[in-house]
A protein has these predicted regions:
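Mid/C-terminal beta-alpha module of Rossmann-like enzyme folds, strongest
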Residues: 2, 15, 200-257, 296-299
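N-terminal Rossmann NAD(P)H-binding glycine-rich loop of SDR-like oxidoreductase domains
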Residues: 3-25
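C-terminal amphipathic/interface module of NAD(P)-dependent oxidoreductases
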Residues: 50, 258-300
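NAD(P)-cofactor binding segment of oxidoreductase domains
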Residues: 61-104, 108, 113
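Active-site "gating" loop of Rossmann-like NAD(P)-dependent oxidoreductase/epimerase domains
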Residues: 108-132, 147-148
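Glycine/proline-rich active-site loop of Rossmann-fold NAD(P)-dependent oxidoreductases
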Residues: 136, 160-172, 177, 205-215, ...
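Conserved beta-loop-beta element that borders a ligand/cofactor-binding pocket
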Residues: 139-163
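A conserved pocket-lining segment of Rossmann-fold NAD(P)-dependent short-chain dehydrogenase/reductase
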Residues: 173-194
Length: 300
């Protein structure tokens, strides 16, 4: 298939590009400049320079694809509008061209705190974390565009680890810098997680199977934040030393994202087997040493 990936050099996007190219697909990554376009060659993909805020820079390219995967996002007010513009542009291109599948990247924060009962794809998004309060409307834009010709899917990844690290890299970084992995609050909140390689395979499965609707990309393990920090500390050679940062102190430094980072979530999926996917990586606690080695290699 001919597949366009936005955010193609990002943490998730680059993994998706590499997975799709390795599987024999003709992948084009939408990037912001020529330097990033050149990076994609190492992943077996082509680069195309465009700006999500400028529909004319990628609309025709998108219309000529078999599938579109939107992973790009800029965490800012302008980024929210750019995301909405991108969705509208990609959908219009899909309807005007040959596109058969469109996949949108959301996240589990739209579900808010879930409590102890596993939360599946049909759960409400009425109480999302405030920082992503806009996102359920963007999910709906994608989902209502589904038709017999166009399969639309929303992927909600858990906390991603592996490779260059994502959020988990901050625990490795603080362990190295301060001698203890720092986390926010009491650490009893649970994190649904997924290795970046498993997530890339997940996207490939959704595209190849023309998945429709909402999918939770999680490995089935809800791990307490304090345990994640301790495992990161041990992997970083700090003997499991951790330090809790009070929520109020973290909010003063980091803003509203803190309330998303301390969500207590138990997320599950009833749909992964529909697309023939299961995680190959055990879980973060069992793979912290490997994840740290990957992070160090990517940071070198």
């Amino acid at each position: 298939m001919r597949i366009l990936v936005t955010g193609a050099t990002g943490y998730i996007g680059s993994a998706v590009v590499g997975e799709l190219a390795a599987a024999g697909h003709e992948v084009t990554g939408l990037v912001r400049d020529e330097e990033k376009a050149r990076r994609l060659a190492a992943l077996g993909a082509q680069g195309a320079v465009g700006n999500l805020r400028e529909p004319g820079s990628y609309r025709d390219l998108a219309a000529g694809q078999d599938a579109l995967i939107h992973t790009a996002f800029e965490p800012s007010a302008e980024g929210v509008q750019a995301d909405r513009t991108a969705i509208g542009t990609l959908l219009a291109a899909a309807l005007a061209g040959r596109v058969r599948t469109l996949v949108y990247t959301s996240g589990i924060w739209v579900l808010g705190t879930t409590g102890d009962t596993p939360t599946f794809e049909d759960a409400t998004t009425e109480h999302p974390a405030a920082i992503v309060a806009w996102r359920p409307a963007h999910e709906k834009m994608v989902l209502v565009a589904e038709s017999s010709q166009l399969a639309t899917a929303v992927v909600r990844p858990g906390v991603v680890y592996g490779g260059r690290g994502g959020l988990i890299g901050s625990y490795f970084r603080s362990a190295e810098k301060h001698g203890a992995a720092e986390y926010i609050g009491n650490g009893r909140n649970r994190l649904p997680m997924i290795h970046v390689e498993d997530l890339a395979r997940f996207y490939r499965a959704v595209v190849e199977q023309r998945g429709r609707g909402i999918f939770h990309a999680v490995d089935g393990n809800a791990v307490q934040l304090a345990d994640v920090a301790q495992a990161a500390s041990e992997a970083a050679g700090q003997g499991g030393a951790v330090r809790s940062i009070p929520v109020a102190e973290a909010r003063a430094k980091m803003g509203p994202v803190v309330d998303a980072l301390i969500l207590d979530q138990v997320i599950a999926s009833r749909r992964n087997l529909e697309i023939g996917w299961r995680p190959l990586h055990e879980n973060f606690l069992g793979e912290a040493d490997r994840a740290y080695a990957e992070w160090k290699a990517a940071s070198a």
